[in-house]
């Protein structure tokens, strides 16, 4: 019985150390910023949207699926994140079309003015929130800078 309690105590201690280390090493923007959360929240949504909005902060700051639904009855979802680059939007669209076939996709081309990532933090807001998939892998390859 003592041996069992000792093993149990060691396992609990390992779990606590792992949990605390994970909290310490987790990028602070993962919990503190709303930007990018629509990327991850999408996976918990019903996949029957009539309209999908894809793009950078111009999209999530200016389109409200709740207001659109209340005023028109049209279901929609915003798959936007800060400084979402054009190629990131492409891969998000490709991934979205695996889950559902919306009637309309509003694709923001504002990001065409950027030809490289602005900052790693914004890059990661989009990348880190996606589920692992072929699209995420391709997006990571396309988003890497020369130093990475």
Residue ranges and their predicted role:
Residues 1-2:
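N-terminal hydrophobic targeting signals that begin at the initiator methionine
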Residues 21-30, 75-83:
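Acidic/glycine-enriched edge-of-secondary-structure segments
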Residues 26-47:
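Alpha-helical transmembrane signal-anchor/signal-peptide segments
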Residues 6-24:
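Hydrophobic membrane-insertion alpha-helices, especially the h-region
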Residues 148:
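Serine-dependent acyl-ester chemistry module
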Residues 54, 58-144:
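Membrane-embedded segments
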Residues 11-15, 30-37, 61:
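Short, surface-exposed loop/strand segments
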